[in-house]
Regions:
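C-terminal catalytic ATP-binding subdomain
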Residues: 1-19, 140
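Charged docking surfaces used in two-component/phosphorelay signaling
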Residues: 40-44
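Short hydrophobic/Thr-rich beta-strand motif most characteristic of the beta2 strand and flanking loop
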Residues: 50-56, 64, 124
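Active-site beta3 strand of CheY-like receiver
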Residues: 68-74
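Receiver (REC) domain active-site loop signature in two-component systems and cognate sites
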Residues: 79
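C-terminal output helix
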Residues: 128-137
Length: 142
């Protein structure tokens, strides 16, 4: 009987751990992208995996992160109104925890370093590789 109780306790612990992990899993991803076709491509890759929000520029992204519940940001670096590096720096002033992943056509090391220095947690290069995008999001809990 004590063995059965221990198994039940272990099962309860696993259920508690599962529910705690579920709470941490990013579910809402903000895609900051000014080119509609790129947003549609990301949307099709992430379809049914995350709830998506969209901002066409960095200024709107900062406002969305400030006012809505967002778990992860995919940030284009070159956009009108406010670029991705500036938006990332602004977000970091009030939210140091949210994962921000640069998603950009700029593939040079200097661009990568600049994005990471601005506060991005990771860096993905366009054209978008669906498998790489999914693997990266999985690493951040989505």
């Amino acid at each position: 009987t004590s063995s059965r109780r221990n198994n039940e306790k272990d099962a309860n612990k696993e259920n508690i751990l599962d529910s705690e992990e579920t709470k941490k899993v990013p579910k809402t991803v903000l895609v900051v992208e000014d080119i509609q076709s790129n947003f549609f491509l990301v949307s099709s890759i992430l379809k049914n995996k995350c709830q998506l929000l969209h901002a066409p520029n960095g200024l709107e992204a900062v406002e969305i992160v400030r006012t809505q519940s967002v778990d992860l940001v995919l940030m284009d670096m070159k956009m009108p109104v406010m670029d991705g590096r500036t938006a990332t720096s602004e977000i970091r002033k009030f939210n140091a925890e949210i994962p921000i992943i640069a998603l950009t056509a700029h593939a040079f090391d200097a661009d990568r370093v600049a994005a990471l220095k601005a506060g991005c947690d990771d860096y993905l290069v366009k054209p978008i590789n669906g498998a790489k995008l999914m693997q990266t999001l999985k690493e951040y809990g989505c």
